[in-house]
Amino acid sequence: MLIDSHAHLDSERYADDRAAMLGRAFEAGVGAVLAIGIGEQAAGMDGALGVCREFNGLAGMPRLYASAGIYPHNTHEADDAVLAKLDGLLGEPEVIACGEIGLDYYHEGAPREVQRAGLIKQLEIAAARKRPILIHCRGTNETTDAWDDLFEILDAHWRPSGLGGVMHCFGGG
């Protein structure tokens, strides 16, 4: 059995073909899919859970699981309400991981200090919910700036949890 560990199934670009796409995946031997719940904005991070609930249990479809998290460029939206929503989503049985979270210094987005603070808040929620993390980390060209910051944050705020995770986006050498 194959497992797709990172699929943005809630993206609108798949809306018209989502059921057929999942059916083709199942026919090709994909038995499970982790739908990444980041949405187009932080408030939409529940979209992957919605897809899971729509398709789970249907014949000829892979088993779907979801993650929930705030993408680095959306961390400026991580107010108390959004963080409470993340906490609630991580309590749902189908939501098995927190992500895609991390740091992205390559594209212009949320300021670096906002990304770092947002990541720390999400790590705290994931640890409290005992959910692994899915990390997205991308630095500027030819530098390790994002990676240096990420490892410092993980050492201080994630390692003590004893939980694991997956490095999804890698741009290092």
Regions found by a protein language model. Give the residues of each.
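Mid-domain alpha/beta scaffold segments of enzyme catalytic cores
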Residues: 1-173
